[in-house]
Structures are given as C-alpha cells and as structure tokens.
C-alpha cells in the first residue's frame, strides 16, 4: 500500500499556498499538516533527512531571521542536537515540505511537483 503524500505547510507562507493550489489543480491527494501546530516528530524528521541529497542543508531555512538570530554553527552540532532544535523551532524548516514513501520535495518547485504527479498518475493507472 502506498503511503499518502504528507504536505507540511504554514498558511501564511506564499510557497505553501502556491504548492497547495498546484496539488489541488493536479488532483493529487495529500494529508496537510500545519508545520508549527503539528511539528514533525523526531522519526519523521529522520525520514525526511534520509530522502535528502544534501542533508540538513536541504531542509534548513538558513536565510530565515529565526536562524540568523540563533547564531549557530550547525556543522558543529550532532544530528540529535539538530533534530531537537528543529522540533523546538520548526520555523527553521524550509517550507513547504512534501514527503511520501520515496520522494521529497522542498519548497514550491513545479518541476519536482510534476515528477511527483507523474509518479502518482503512473501508480494509479496500473
């Protein structure tokens, strides 16, 4: 059984709204989770990290004011410390985050969303 697409979003985020509109327009089912009210668990974050190609840099919002205010050197932190930080301060996560059983899309990226759409379409027609 295929895991449904999970869409971590924040309603006032422009990229999240664009992504949600795109998903609906392409009739892709998803389970939306408010990133700050339903923060990803440690296990979910580990899974998201396992799908990245660039590790933490791919999901960390380094340009955010929250990140800048912390004045941290992520490179010196352990994975567990980073996970705890992301759970405590989910604003440090880039958004939106879309994840299913084998695919991860970060941000509004129509090209990547299209790949996700094609994968879903192929699966549904089989």
UniProtKB/Swiss-Prot annotation:
Changing residue 33 to E: Strong decrease in MgsR stability. Strong decrease in activity. Disruption phenotype: Deletion of the gene results in differential expression of approximately 70 genes in response to ethanol stress compared with the wild-type strain. SUPFAM superfamilies: Thioredoxin-like. Disulfide bonds join 13-16. Changing residue 13 to S: Loss of activity. Strongly diminishes expression of mgsR and of the MgsR regulon. Changing residue 55 to R: Loss of activity. Strongly diminishes expression of mgsR and of the MgsR regulon. Gene3D superfamilies: Glutaredoxin. Pfam families: ArsC (PF03960). GO terms for cellular component: cytoplasm. It is found in: Cytoplasm. Activity is controlled at multiple levels. Regulation includes a positive autoregulatory loop on mgsR transcription and a post-translational redox-sensitive activation step by an intramolecular disulfide bond formation in response to ethanol stress. In addition, protein stability is strictly controlled by rapid proteolytic degradation by the ClpXP and ClpCP proteases. The McsB protein-arginine kinase might serve as a proteolytic adapter for the ClpX ATPase in the degradation mechanism of MgsR. Keywords: Activator, Cytoplasm, Disulfide bond, Redox-active center, Repressor, Stress response, Transcription, Transcription regulation. Induction: Expression is sigma B-dependent. Induced by ethanol, heat and salt stress. Positively autoregulated. Regulates transcription of a subregulon within the general stress response. Exerts positive and negative effects in response to ethanol stress. Belongs to the ArsC family. PANTHER family: ARSENATE REDUCTASE, GLOBAL TRANSCRIPTIONAL REGULATOR SPX. This is Regulatory protein MgsR. It comes from Bacillus subtilis (strain 168).
């Amino acid at each position: 059984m295929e895991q449904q697409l999970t869409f971590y979003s924040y309603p006032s985020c422009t990229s999240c709204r664009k992504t949600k509109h795109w998903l609906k327009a392409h009739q892709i089912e998803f389970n939306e989770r408010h990133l700050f009210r339903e923060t990803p668990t440690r296990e979910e974050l580990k899974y998201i990290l396992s799908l990245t190609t660039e590790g933490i840099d791919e999901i960390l919002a380094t340009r955010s004011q929250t990140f800048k205010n912390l004045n941290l050197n992520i490179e010196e932190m352990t994975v567990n410390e980073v996970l705890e930080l992301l759970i405590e301060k989910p604003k440090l996560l880039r958004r939106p985050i879309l994840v299913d059983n084998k695919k991860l899309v970060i941000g509004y990226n129509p090209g990547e969303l299209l790949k996700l759409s094609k994968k879903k379409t192929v699966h549904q027609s089989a």
